[in-house]
UniProtKB/Swiss-Prot annotation:
It catalyses: 2 (2E,6E)-farnesyl diphosphate = 15-cis-4,4'-diapophytoene + 2 diphosphate. It comes from Staphylococcus aureus. Belongs to the phytoene/squalene synthase family. CrtM subfamily. Mg(2+) 1 binds at D48, D52. This is 4,4'-diapophytoene synthase.
Amino acid sequence: MTMMDMNFKYCHKIMKKHSKSFSYAFDLLPEDQRKAVWAIYAVCRKIDDSIDVYGDIQFLNQIKEDIQSIEKYPYEYHHFQSDRRIMMALQHVAQHKNIAFQSFYNLIDTVYKDQHFTMFETDAELFGYCYGVAGTVGEVLTPILSDHETHQTYDVARRLGESLQLINILRDVGEDFENERIYFSKQRLKQYEVDIAEVYQNGVNNHYIDLWEYYAAIAEKDFRDVMDQIKVFSIEAQPIIELAARIYIEILDEVRQANYTLHERVFVEKRKKAKLFHEINSKYHRI
């Protein structure tokens, strides 16, 4: 195993640890594509964790400087400051793919702002956040998952990322509240007459369910729109993207089956993932 192989393996471990659903799906890509996904996922995870886990603004700055070095001089040797193994893997990807570096910087800017979290006044602000933390990831992955990236390809990948982030929010309402965060907008909370603190303490009510389903309908519509345009991605990537997205959309039904609880995190069981895999395998005849 070469040093570069070890770098990618390190990135893969990060992906498997933090996103079993993504790993389950994207590990089915051809080798070069899945390695690129591992590297990009690991970079994005380190960006997220720099503040959420480490509380280290200097580390986030180092990540940004390392990415800038790769963008400016992709073929030169660099003394990376953040995580050398991840950055070497990203540099290798950047030498072969047209990486949308600005999307990394947009993600970093969102993480900067997230240090001083305040509730969103409107849904527009919420959806802007979903773009910043997840739509950006879709943009960065676009050259990996498509043969000829176009404006439409970037748009579809961005919408998929935003949809998956909204699903994360719908899954983690209780956990986020425990961390003193409410992502639903004040505008919509007022409209549906919902107080998350009250729901957390006293239990789910019809007002909360209606609010939750309002946002779930948005995520489900975006999911359907992405599936309708799945052919913008490469033949190899289409079934993988559909598998990842369908596993994620299943999370919404898991929340419903758990009576919209705010006191436990739901997940999609392995047997359901396997069932989806076989369905999509039959549809595409190529996974």
